[in-house]
């Protein structure tokens, strides 16, 4: 059976953008990469309850800009901006001699965000809710929010079974091989008493038409 390629990585440069936007020479590349990893882990751990979907990192000279996509921006910003200042001060200890700018972006439809759906299912599994119920409820909410299709997968000792297995549930269409298809992908882990359970979610949000077509239309109009 063929293995599934990461839907985001497959579409980078086609309809998706990089989550890290910076350039570095050989000497600094590894340091920047490790720094990015530490920043992402810290923000995710520190603001897990706020529902952080993804983090974009932009670098320029001695400045780092973070675009944090979250379902609950108020939880990160805090009262009078205290939360965001506290986060900035903590991050300043991770990155030395660099100014940090934090931009909070609200996720308008968290029910249709793959990463947030995966984390929600994982949280329910940790609360001992049946995995089938958790998956089906998430699928129903996603379809009501207006997505074209959704697929979920849970892997591990489901229901405390002796032998680990994987169960899939899906609704709508998920064209994984179509590059112009806007497929959102999320992964989370649930720590249960029987061990870890991996949760994967694919969400199809519709087709993104290539920009080249729009350019051709403009050329025809000008002719």
UniProtKB/Swiss-Prot annotation:
Family statement drawn from the similarity comment of this UniProt entry: Belongs to the universal ribosomal protein uS3 family.
One term of GO molecular function: rRNA binding
Keyword Ribonucleoprotein assigned: yes
Segments forming domain KH type-2: 39-108
GO cellular component, one term: cytosolic small ribosomal subunit
Organism of this sequence: Clostridium botulinum (strain Langeland / NCTC 10281 / Type F)
Assigned keywords, A-Z: Ribonucleoprotein, Ribosomal protein, RNA-binding, rRNA-binding
A Gene Ontology BP annotation from the UniProt entry: translation
Chain's role: Binds the lower part of the 30S subunit head. Binds mRNA in the 70S ribosome, positioning it for translation.
InterPro entries assigned: KH_dom, KH_dom-like_a/b, KH_dom_type_2, KH_sf_prok-type, Ribosomal_S3_C_sf, Ribosomal_uS3_bac-typ, Ribosomal_uS3_C, Ribosomal_uS3_CS
Protein name: Small ribosomal subunit protein uS3
Self-association state and partner proteins as the record states: Part of the 30S ribosomal subunit. Forms a tight complex with proteins S10 and S14.
Record flagged with keyword rRNA-binding: yes
Gene that produces this protein: rpsC
One Pfam family matching this protein: KH_2
């Amino acid at each position: 059976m063929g293995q599934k390629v990461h839907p985001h990585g497959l579409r980078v440069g086609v309809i998706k953008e990089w989550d890290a936007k910076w350039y570095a020479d050989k000497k600094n590349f590894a340091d920047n990469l490790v720094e990015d990893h530490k920043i992402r882990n810290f923000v995710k751990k520190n603001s897990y309850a706020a529902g952080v979907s993804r983090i974009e990192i932009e670098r320029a000279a001695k400045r780092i800009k973070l675009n944090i996509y979250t379902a609950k921006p108020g939880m990160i910003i805090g009262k009078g901006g205290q939360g965001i200042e506290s986060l900035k001060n903590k991050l300043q200890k991770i990155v030395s001699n660099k100014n940090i700018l934090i931009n909070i972006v609200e996720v308008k439809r968290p029910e249709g965000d793959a990463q947030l759906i995966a984390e929600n299912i994982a949280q329910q599994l940790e609360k001992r809710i049946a995995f089938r119920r958790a998956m089906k409820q998430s699928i129903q909410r996603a379809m009501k929010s207006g997505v074209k299709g959704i697929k979920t997968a849970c892997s591990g000792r489901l229901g405390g079974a002796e032998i680990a297995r994987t169960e899939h549930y899906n609704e709508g269409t998920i064209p994984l091989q179509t590059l112009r298809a806007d497929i959102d992908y999320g992964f989370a882990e649930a720590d249960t008493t029987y061990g870890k359970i991996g949760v994967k979610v694919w969400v199809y949000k519709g087709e993104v038409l290539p920009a080249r077509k729009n350019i051709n239309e403009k050329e025809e109009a000008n002719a």
